A protein has these predicted regions:
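Short, electropositive alpha-helical surface patch
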Residues: 34, 87-90, 162-175
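A structural motif
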Residues: 9-10, 62, 110, 166
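Active-site-adjacent beta->alpha loops and helix N-cap segments on the catalytic face
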Residues: 14-33, 44-51, 69-86, 98-104, ...
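Conserved, mostly hydrophobic/aromatic
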Residues: 5, 24, 105, 113, ...
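Catalytic domains of carbohydrate-active enzymes, especially glycoside hydrolases
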Residues: 2-14, 59-61
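Catalytic cores of alpha/beta
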Residues: 1, 44-57, 97-109, 143, ...
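Hydrophobic faces of well-ordered beta-strands that scaffold small-molecule active sites
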Residues: 13, 32-36, 65-67, 92-95, ...
């Protein structure tokens, strides 16, 4: 799947999990954003929650390490995770939900600001179907590299994100979660047949 994305023109990849990263790294030459997703009853934070995650990601070939930059509790403080990313020689990407998250991360030395968590935190829950283009515009004012991410689920939304100020766009579930795309096609077909 990673090679297919690169063959299709992807300029980089976002890879979840150490084993996936180890499998993909030797096969592609594009930059890889590495993350580890962890589910825990102790915290709603799921993306790169510990310094040990960071070490494993960088040792496995991640060029960039993304972490949850929201102000929610987690195993290791977000400041410690950022320090670990930088100490391990990787580029830091902050997965943010608000402009405040982005400002704090940018001031702390993060190179890439992502709208990844907009709509996925208690403070930002939304029924919106598309990416948070207003947040992209707000991030652009920080003079940082801006990654539009989250709910970019059709090709027509990617240029909209770029026009709003994104330097780059991450397309996730629309490409990787085939069950969601299949269900969307089935729903449309069934709706027309009824």
């Amino acid at each position: 799947m990673a090679q297919a994305a690169v063959n299709g023109g992807a300029a980089g990849l976002r890879i979840e999990g150490i084993e996936n990263l180890r499998a993909v790294r030797p096969l592609v030459d594009v930059p890889i954003i590495g993350i580890v997703k962890t589910d825990s009853d102790d915290t709603p934070v799921r993306i790169t929650v510990s310094k040990s995650d960071v070490s494993a990601l960088t040792e496995s070939g991640a060029d960039i390490v993304a972490y949850d930059a929201t102000d929610r509790p987690r195993k290791d403080p977000k400041e410690a995770i950022l320090a670990s990313i930088l100490a391990n020689g990787a580029i830091a990407m902050a997965d943010c939900s608000t402009l405040v998250d982005a400002r704090v991360a940018h001031a702390a030395g993060v190179a890439i600001l992502g709208t990844t968590l907009s709509g996925y935190t208690a403070a930002t829950e939304t029924d919106g179907e598309g990416p948070d283009l207003e947040l992209v515009r707000q991030f652009r004012t920080l003079n940082a590299f801006v990654m539009a991410e989250g709910r970019v689920n059709t090709p027509s939304l990617a240029p909209d994100a770029m026009a709003a100020g994104a330097d780059c766009v991450t397309v996730g579930s629309a490409l990787t979660r085939l069950e969601l795309m299949t269900a969307a096609f089935v729903k449309k077909i069934q709706g027309r047949l009824q």
